[in-house]
């Protein structure tokens, strides 16, 4: 069985054990530190670096026990007397008490959270649990921590060749931004997270209709955090105002009219800054099935790098300085460096 979403670790004062929480499988792994160090020392350097971190069999040599917990265990604290440890069971609002002599859960403390399991709460619990994946290897939260992104690209095609990477997209604020998937072929979250999920991700039976409805509902409630580049109610800085003018412009620096589809605001207009359509912006790679990709929303775009459908742009600047040679992703090649900097400053405020 997998050990998804390892979240926190604490070592006993005597240095004998390390306790690691798995928020995706509702367990704590008890690691015998001496056995782990012995394994590391006897392995050749190559295996230490390249095999041990990914070998699913090695943990049997140093994980001596798994302790069941409440839902979604995260933080863990070991008391200085080496007698007890406490773990936060985040999604059932309890504090678990562990007897370190027995390495067992001996009690819980109710933290007074809501007792009714609403549709949103149930969806949140399902989102954070790896029960739906083969061997419980990962949860929805594994790739979308806090409903956001892990900064990775994935090849999720079933051929297993690894030649069609796609950028992981945020789930924050995606209500009313359908369609989904970079190719824009899923018209709803139910389509995105339903049977398709079982085929390409979980390799098990899909969510039941009731579970799927709860997960979908929870995803639509994941909020965007406050924008750190533009506090609520704040006016734009001079650079941000200049960037907005670039974003909204209809003429290039030489006075020529910019074609409608080459204007930023044509495809990215408020409030979500997406027209919810597919466009070819010149980023198609040789193994891509299509060059038409879904227009992502731009809200809080500053913290969702990398960019473009396959994550090839490491920064916002690279979208236009490296991957827009023919002005197919907006008319930008006439811009000065200062203008591009201002545009990026404005984009960070969205």
Q: Residue spans of the language-model regions?
A:
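Periplasmic c-type cytochrome electron-transfer domains
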Residues: 1-350
């Amino acid at each position: 069985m997998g050990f998804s979403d390892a979240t926190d670790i604490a070592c006993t004062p005597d240095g004998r054990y390390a306790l690691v929480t798995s928020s995706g499988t509702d367990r704590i792994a008890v690691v015998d530190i001496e056995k782990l160090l012995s394994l590391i020392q006897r392995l050749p350097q190559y295996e230490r670096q390249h095999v041990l971190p990914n070998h699913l069999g090695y943990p049997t040599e140093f994980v001596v026990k798994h302790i069941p917990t409440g839902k979604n265990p995260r933080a863990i604290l070991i008391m200085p007397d080496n007698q007890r440890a406490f773990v936060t069971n985040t999604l059932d609002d309890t504090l678990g008490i562990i007897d370190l002599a027995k390495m067992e859960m001996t009690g819980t403390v109710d933290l007074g959270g809501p007792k009714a399991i609403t549709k949103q709460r149930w969806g949140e619990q399902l989102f954070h649990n790896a029960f739906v994946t083969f061997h419980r290897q990962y949860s929805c939260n594994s790739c979308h921590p806090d409903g956001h992104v892990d900064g990775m690209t994935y090849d999720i095609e079933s051929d297993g060749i690894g030649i069609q990477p796609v950028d992981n997209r945020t789930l924050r604020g995606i209500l009313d931004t359908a369609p989904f998937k970079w190719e824009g072929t899923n018209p709803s979250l139910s389509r995105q997270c339903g049977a398709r999920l079982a085929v390409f991700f979980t390799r098990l039976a899909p969510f039941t209709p009731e579970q799927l409805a709860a997960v979908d509902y929870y995803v639509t409630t994941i909020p965007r955090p406050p924008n750190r580049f533009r506090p609520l109610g704040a006016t734009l800085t001079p650079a941000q105002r200049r960037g907005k003018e670039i974003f909204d412009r209809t003429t290039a620096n030489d006075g020529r009219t910019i074609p409608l589809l080459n204007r930023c605001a044509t495809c990215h207009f408020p409030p979500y800054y997406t027209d919810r359509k597919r466009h070819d912006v010149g980023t198609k790679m040789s193994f891509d099935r299509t060059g038409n990709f879904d227009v992502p929303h731009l809200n809080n775009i500053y913290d969702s790098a990398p960019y473009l459908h396959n994550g090839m742009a490491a920064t916002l600047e690279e979208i236009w300085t490296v991957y827009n040679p023919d002005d197919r992703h907006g008319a930008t090649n006439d811009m000065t460096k200062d203008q591009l900097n201002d545009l990026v400053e404005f984009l960070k405020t969205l």
